[in-house]
């Protein structure tokens, strides 16, 4: 295996890289053994390497890199031992999500941050953005925070045509990739002095995409310190509802009556699920508790709680792909070199960070 004696793996990065692939140490050892031409690699060896009790360099570094499908320099980068500040990571997840899957998502988020930073540094992009923290309390509600942010970002009244474009224009980093779980739609992280990062699950239903993203936006602007998880989740939902469906504008569409047919009609206009529209109608007093529950029962009977009718295209981030395009056009890098900057093999890099204009 090709390696370099000048490179030494960072123990915490070995752990982060492994967890981003969803592997245990035994899984890692098995994959390394498969690639090592008959030489057995034990779980104990992987454990010692991740604990920093032995030096990983040269051919052994190359073996780790081949197994993990990252470049050797990627495994030598420094990062926080915990990957990301877990208390400042927010996500929309189901209660059924296991600890191993959640660790994988957190590790993927941290690795994605490193990859995006490498791409932006090469493109000399900087960290400018228009996000700020907005405090909420008994007087200033999540809905107030959403209204404030809409005004500051110059959004017109009514529905938002493209939420991804709005966030990227404000300086956010958005990446869509397969998070290997159906229990989580999105996760976000905003370290001090850096751009907010939103990682979106490519397997999440398209009609949940925008609400999940707006939910994470709410976390980012309102929750800069750890707090009560249940309360913060409710606040993020309230923020998302007002940000995507401002009360005055959506009331005009809901007051004529709310039934399944009306929800189907309004779904593409507001870019949210029928379920989200029904919740909004209830929160604004258009539907009583009994009417809301009856509507949910009807939706369940028709299978709409699993797959709703009326689909629309998922919004696609473009900023990082455009940076890759500029690296190719202005800095004369080919895609393989750009992938190496991000620490990825070409196929995975192209899938995550490239758009049609960047692969021509």
Task: Mark where each language-model region is.
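Active-site hotspot residues in diverse enzymes, especially metal/ion-binding acidic/histidine motifs
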Residues: 1-360
